[in-house]
C-alpha cells in the first residue's frame, strides 16, 4: 500500500477539514442444520477502509476493531491488535495494558460454532474465533501494526471457548467463556522479545462474555 497524496493544507468546509475514504465490509454467515437439536454456524468477516486525497487516516469511528461478545470473544473489546503490535506499557518490569482503544484499517475475523440443545430452554455451544486488525500504512507509534501478506496468518489471534444459552424465544441470553490460546501481542515476536528481557507478561486468562442474542 502506498502513501496518500493529501493536499497541504487539507481542504475545509465551514472551517473544518473533511475526510475522504473508501470502506468495504463483507460479512458471510452460513448456518448448517445437522438435525433438530444440533447446528453448525460459521462466519467470515472482512473489512477494509482506505483514506485518500484529503485524508491520511480514516475517521476514528469508521475504523475496525476486534474483541468483545460479538467478535473474538477471548479478548476484551478494542484491546487487541493491530497486527503483531504489543499493546502494553512496561512499568516496573511489568507489562500493563494500554488504556487507549486499538483500531485499524483492515479486519479479518472467522468463527466456527457448534450449537446443541441440552434440555428445555438451555442450549450449549463450542466455538473458536480467529482474526485480527491491521493498519494499511506504517504506524510509528504501533510497530508491527501494518498488514503484510507474508506475516498476517501468524498474527491471527485464536480464541476457543464454550457457552451456555437460555432461549426464551423472543430473547436469547448468552454466556460465553473463551480463552486467548494465541495472542499475537503476547505470543508474537514483540511480546517474546520483552519476555527474554525479563519483563513479566500478563497471565492469559479466560474471558467471560454476557450478551443478548447469538454472536452471528
Pin down the residues of each PLM region.
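C-terminal outer-membrane beta-barrel translocator/porin domains of Gram-negative envelope proteins
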Residues: 1-116, 126-149
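Transmembrane beta-strands of outer-membrane beta-barrel proteins
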Residues: 40-44, 124-128, 162, 173-175, ...
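Strand-loop-strand
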Residues: 140-168, 195
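Short acidic-hydrophobic sequence patches enriched in Asp/Glu that either
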Residues: 20, 156, 204
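Surface-exposed intrinsically disordered loops and tails
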Residues: 96-97, 187-203
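Flexible, small/polar- and glycine-enriched "cap/hinge" segments at structural transition points
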Residues: 129-131, 136, 161, 165, ...
Amino acid at each position: 500500500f502506498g502513501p496518500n497524496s493529501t493536499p497541504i493544507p487539507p481542504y475545509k468546509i465551514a472551517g473544518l477539514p473533511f475526510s475522504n475514504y473508501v470502506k468495504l465490509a463483507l460479512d458471510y454467515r452460513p448456518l448448517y442444520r445437522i438435525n433438530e437439536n444440533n447446528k453448525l454456524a460459521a462466519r467470515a468477516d472482512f473489512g477494509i477502509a482506505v483514506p485518500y486525497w484529503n485524508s491520511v487516516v480514516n475517521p476514528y469511528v469508521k475504523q475496525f476493531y476486534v474483541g468483545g461478545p460479538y467478535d473474538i470473544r477471548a479478548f476484551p473489546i478494542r484491546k487487541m491488535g493491530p497486527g503483531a503490535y504489543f499493546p502494553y506499557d512496561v512499568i516496573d518490569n511489568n507489562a500493563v495494558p494500554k488504556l487507549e482503544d486499538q483500531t485499524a484499517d483492515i479486519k479479518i475475523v472467522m468463527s466456527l460454532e457448534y450449537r446443541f440443545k441440552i434440555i428445555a430452554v438451555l442450549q450449549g455451544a463450542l466455538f473458536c474465533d480467529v482474526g485480527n486488525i491491521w493498519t494499511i500504512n506504517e504506524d510509528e507509534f504501533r510497530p508491527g501494526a501494518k498488514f503484510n501478506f507474508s506475516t498476517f496468518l501468524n498474527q491471527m489471534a485464536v480464541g476457543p471457548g464454550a457457552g451456555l444459552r437460555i432461549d426464551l424465544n423472543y430473547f436469547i441470553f448468552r454466556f460465553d467463556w473463551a480463552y486467548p490460546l494465541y495472542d499475537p501481542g503476547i505470543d508474537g515476536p514483540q511480546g517474546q522479545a520483552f519476555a527474554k528481557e525479563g519483563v513479566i507478561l500478563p497471565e492469559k486468562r479466560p474471558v467471560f462474555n454476557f450478551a443478548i442474542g447469538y454472536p452471528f
